[in-house]
Amino acid sequence: MNRDAHTVQAQEKLSERCSDCATLSYDLHIHSCLSPCGDDDMTPGNIVGMAAIKGLDVIAVTDHNSCKNCPAVMKLAAQYGILVIPGMELTTAEEVHAVCLFPELSAALEFDRFVYEKLIKFPNREDIFGKQQIMNEEDICIGTEPNLLINSTTLSFDELWDI
């Protein structure tokens, strides 16, 4: 399997740091500033910085119906030996919130495109829900998502289960 470069780098540093670790510390449900429920301070740099301060070995970025901030977090975290599992909190047609985790960034981004086609499009109102910011690894906003990401998708739970 072809591994993403940032995943390989993080795994190598994690292996060095935890060669005799009996346990790993992790948080597998983190929202960034892309999620409407996330704070504007939840930038890639702040997520990675807090993970390092807390001594986390593994984190997963799981924004609502999007994986677009995973690349920046993965790039930064690899420098600290923190393994990032790219993910998404998908909202099904039944309003079930399912945390989806991926072995590779490429798989996450492919799923992101698939889910976006299934997202019920409703314009985001920044005055109510806040900005939905797409960031780079320098914590610079490189775009915003115009459609509200906390909406459900047309994807049923059964369809998700079968993927």
Regions found by a protein language model. Name each.
Residues N2-R17, T23, L76-I163:
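Extended substrate/RNA-proximal surfaces in nucleic-acid metabolism proteins
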Residues C18-C21, S32-L34:
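An N-terminal RHG(E/S)-centered segment typical of histidine phosphatases
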Residues Y26-I30, I59-A60, V84-M88:
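Hydrophobic faces of well-ordered beta-strands that scaffold small-molecule active sites
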Residues H29, D63, C100:
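Conserved, mostly hydrophobic/aromatic
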Residues S32-M42:
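Acidic/histidine-rich helix-loop elements
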Residues C33-S35, V61-P71, T91-E94:
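Active-site environment of divalent metal-dependent phosphoester hydrolases
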Residues I47, C70-V73, L160:
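Aromatic/hydrophobic pocket-lining residues that form π-stacking "cages" and hydrophobic walls in ligand
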Residues V48-H64, E89:
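Divalent metal-dependent hydrolysis catalytic cores, especially in the metallo-beta-lactamase
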